C-alpha cells in the first residue's frame, strides 16, 4: 500500500563513482563526483597551460638550485685555498733616491741642502752648513770643527753664542738703575708730548712728604740699588711700561712716609705710662 509505494528501490549494480549506504530502516544511494587531480592542474587547465610547460618550469628551477649549490661549494674551496697564501711587500726606496739624484744632476730640481740618511756619517759634502740658509759657511764650519770628530761641547757653545747674539740684536730697554743716558740716540725718547707727560708723573711723585723725608734721610752719595730711584723719562719705554715703573717707584717711597698723628699720640701715651 502506501508504505510499499514509498519504498525506494536500490539497484544491485553500483554505478561508476557512486557509493551505497545501508541502514536498518531504509537504503539511501549517494553519488560521488570524480575527484580532480590537484588545484594547480585546475589552474593550468583554465589558463591553457599544459603539463609539459609545468614540467619545464620545474626542471629549470631544479637546475638553478643545483647551480647555486655548486657555486657555494666552489667558494668554500677557494676560501680554504686562500688561507694558505702568503703576501710579501717590497718597498723600493732606492728607486726614489736614484730618481732624486737624476733630477738634481739634470738641474730639474734644486734643493738648499743635500739629503743625508741618518745611518750615514756626516761629511763635508753632506753637511748642512753648505746650505744657503745656514748661518755659518762651510769654510767656517771646517775651521771651527775639532779634529777628533763631533764634540757635543762645541755644539753647545755654538748654540749659546748664537743665542747671545740674538739677544744682543733685540732692543735694549734701559731701566732707572742702569744709566740716565743711553749710548745711542735711537734708544732715547725725543717726543716732547711724551716727555712732558712723564715729567708730570715724576713731579707728582716728588711732591709728597715721603719723597721729602727720603731726600733728607738718604743723601745721593749714600743711595744704593735697594733705595728707590726716579724713573728715567728719556728711556725708550711704552706708556704702560713707564706707568709701571712710576707705580713701583711711588710704592717704594711709602717706606719713608712720616708717622701719622695717631701714631704720635699713641707713642706719647706709651711714654707717659712708662714714666709713671
Swiss-Prot record:
Database matches in Gene3D superfamilies: Histone RNA hairpin-binding protein RNA-binding domain (1.10.8.1120)
Modification Phosphoserine, positions:
24, 29, 118, 123, 127, 131, 182
Record-listed Phosphothreonine modification sites: 120
Which residue ranges have biased composition labelled Basic and acidic residues? Answer: 68-83, 213-229
Which residue intervals make up region (Disordered)? 1-35, 50-83, 104-236, 254-276
Query: In which domain of life is the source organism classified?
Result: Eukaryota
- Modification sites for Phosphotyrosine: 177
Query: Sorted alphabetically, which InterPro entries does this protein's record hold?
Result: SLBP1/SLBP2 (IPR026502), SLBP_RNA_bind (IPR029344), SLBP_RNA_bind_sf (IPR038294)
Please list the GO biological process terms of this entry: mitotic chromosome condensation; mRNA 3'-end processing by stem-loop binding and cleavage; mRNA transport
Q: State which tissues express it.
A: In late embryos, expression is restricted to proliferating (CNS and PNS) and endoreplicating (midgut) cell populations.
Transmembrane portions of the chain? none
Q: Does the keyword Coiled coil apply?
A: no
Q: Which UniProt keywords apply?
A: Developmental protein, mRNA processing, Phosphoprotein, RNA-binding
Bias class Low complexity marks the residues at 18-29, 53-67, 121-146, 176-188
Q: Which GO terms describe its cellular component?
A: cytoplasm; histone pre-mRNA 3'end processing complex; nucleus
Please explain the role this protein plays, according to its UniProt record: Involved in histone pre-mRNA 3' processing and couples histone mRNA production with the cell cycle. Both maternal and zygotic proteins play an essential and vital function for development.
Similarity comment:
Belongs to the SLBP family.
Subunit record text? Interacts with Sym and Cpsf73.
UniProt name for this protein: Histone RNA hairpin-binding protein
Taxonomic source organism: Drosophila melanogaster (Fruit fly)
Amino acid at each position: 500500500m502506501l508504505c510499499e509505494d514509498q519504498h525506494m528501490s536500490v539497484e544491485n549494480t553500483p554505478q561508476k563513482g557512486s557509493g551505497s549506504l545501508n541502514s536498518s530502516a531504509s537504503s539511501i544511494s549517494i553519488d560521488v563526483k570524480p575527484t580532480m587531480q590537484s588545484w594547480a592542474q585546475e589552474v593550468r587547465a583554465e589558463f591553457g597551460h599544459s603539463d609539459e610547460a609545468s614540467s619545464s618550469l620545474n626542471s629549470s628551477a631544479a637546475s638553478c638550485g643545483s647551480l647555486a649549490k655548486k657555486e657555494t661549494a666552489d667558494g668554500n674551496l677557494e676560501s680554504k685555498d686562500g688561507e694558505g697564501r702568503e703576501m710579501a711587500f717590497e718597498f723600493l726606496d732606492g728607486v726614489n733616491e736614484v730618481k732624486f739624484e737624476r733630477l738634481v744632476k739634470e738641474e730639474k730640481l734644486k734643493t738648499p741642502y743635500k739629503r743625508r740618511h741618518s745611518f750615514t756619517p756626516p761629511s763635508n759634502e753632506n753637511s748642512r752648513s753648505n746650505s744657503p740658509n745656514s748661518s755659518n759657511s762651510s769654510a767656517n764650519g771646517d775651521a771651527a770643527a775639532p779634529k777628533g770628530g763631533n764634540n757635543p761641547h762645541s755644539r753647545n757653545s755654538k748654540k749659546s753664542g748664537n743665542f747671545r747674539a740674538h739677544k744682543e740684536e733685540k732692543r735694549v730697554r734701559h731701566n732707572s738703575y742702569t744709566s740716565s743716558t743711553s749710548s745711542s740716540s735711537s734708544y732715547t725718547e725725543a717726543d716732547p708730548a711724551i716727555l712732558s707727560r712723564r715729567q708730570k708723573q715724576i713731579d707728582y711723585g716728588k711732591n709728597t712728604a715721603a719723597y721729602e723725608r727720603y731726600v733728607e734721610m738718604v743723601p745721593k752719595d749714600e743711595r744704593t740699588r735697594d733705595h728707590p730711584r726716579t724713573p728715567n723719562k728719556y728711556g725708550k719705554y711704552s706708556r704702560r711700561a713707564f706707568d709701571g715703573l712710576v707705580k713701583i717707584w711711588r710704592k717704594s717711597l711709602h717706606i719713608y712716609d712720616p708717622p701719622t698723628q695717631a701714631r704720635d699720640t699713641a707713642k706719647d701715651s706709651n711714654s707717659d705710662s712708662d714714666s709713671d
